[in-house]
């Protein structure tokens, strides 16, 4: 059931993945899949009668690049957890939605936007995507698919690992 109880999830199989290899294996053996995380969508985009893959345990922060201010995470990382981790490094992502309980993969795939008027996905520089056959495709800013992948609703594949370019943290001031 979704957070607001308007979407009920019915499925044939449910898998809770914790590694990229598990994600690849489930996708490779499944005919139709839907990915879900914290069930924050009011739409039924993640519901269906096929295989559901829960990515909420696929939630590790994998690496930091202190020189380039980049962080790489698994797609099930919760936005609030990512923000807390990069804030400790003095970094931020300057485009944030008003909700921080969503998964990074879900936020990107659905075009989440925020405070700066930009899309969160504009700060994604690289990612790996699991394709329908279970193979892995690495995509970076030089790849012609990068913009399509950024807001793909899962049509092109399932985002696995995602790298964000962060900025130095700053303070907002309100003038009235």
Task: Label every model-predicted segment.
Residues 14, 33-34, 71, 101, ...:
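Residue-level marker of motif borders
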Residues 4, 90-91, 139, 146:
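Hydrophobic alpha-helical segments, principally membrane-spanning helices and signal/leader peptides
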Residues 100-103, 109:
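Extended alpha-helical targeting/anchoring segments
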Residues 107-176:
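FAD-binding subdomain of flavoenzyme oxidoreductases
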Residues 5-98, 111-116:
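Glycine-rich N-terminal segment of FAD-binding domains in flavoprotein oxidoreductases
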Residues 78, 103-104, 119:
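Secondary-structure junction/capping motif
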């Amino acid at each position: 059931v979704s957070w607001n109880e308007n979407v009920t999830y019915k499925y044939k199989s449910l898998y809770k993945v914790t590694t990229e290899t598990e994600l690849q294996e489930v996708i490779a053996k499944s005919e139709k899949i839907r990915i879900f995380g914290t069930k924050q969508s009011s739409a039924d985009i993640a519901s269906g009668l096929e295989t559901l893959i829960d990515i909420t345990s696929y939630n590790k922060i994998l690496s930091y690049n202190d020189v380039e201010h980049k962080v790489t995470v698994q797609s099930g990382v919760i936005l609030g957890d990512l923000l807390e981790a990069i804030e400790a490094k003095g970094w931020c992502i300057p485009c944030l939605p008003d909700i921080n309980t969503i998964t990074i993969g879900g936020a990107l795939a659905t075009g989440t936007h925020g405070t700066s008027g930009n899309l969160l996905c504009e700060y994604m520089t690289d990612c790996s995507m699991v394709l329908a056959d279970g193979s892995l495709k690495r995509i970076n800013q030089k790849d012609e698919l990068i913009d399509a992948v950024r807001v793909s609703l899962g049509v092109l594949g399932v985002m696995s690992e995602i790298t964000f370019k962060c900025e130095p943290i700053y303070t907002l001031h309100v003038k009235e």
